[in-house]
Curated annotation (Swiss-Prot):
Cellular component, GO, one term: plasma membrane
Superkingdom of the source species: Bacteria
Protein name, UniProt field: UPF0391 membrane protein GOX0352
Location in or out of the cell: Cell membrane
Family: Belongs to the UPF0391 family.
Transmembrane annotation, as ranges: 5-25, 33-53
Topology relative to the membrane: Multi-pass membrane protein
Keywords, in A-Z order: Cell membrane, Membrane, Transmembrane, Transmembrane helix
Lineage, uppermost ranks: Bacteria, Pseudomonadati, Pseudomonadota, Alphaproteobacteria, Acetobacterales
Amino acid sequence: MLHYAIVFFIISIIAGVFGFSGISAATAGIAKLFFIVFLVLAVLAILAGVAGLHAL
C-alpha cells in the first residue's frame, strides 16, 4: 500500500510542476486537477498503509 502512496505522490508532484510552472495555459487547469486528485489518493493510500488496510 505504501508503494501506491509513493506512486501517487510522484504523479502529483509531476502534475504540480506542469500545472504551476506556466508551461501551457490550456493544460494548466488539467494539471492542477490531477495534482489535487493524486495528492488526495496519496494521502488516502498512506493512511490506509499506516492503518494496516491492505484491501483497497
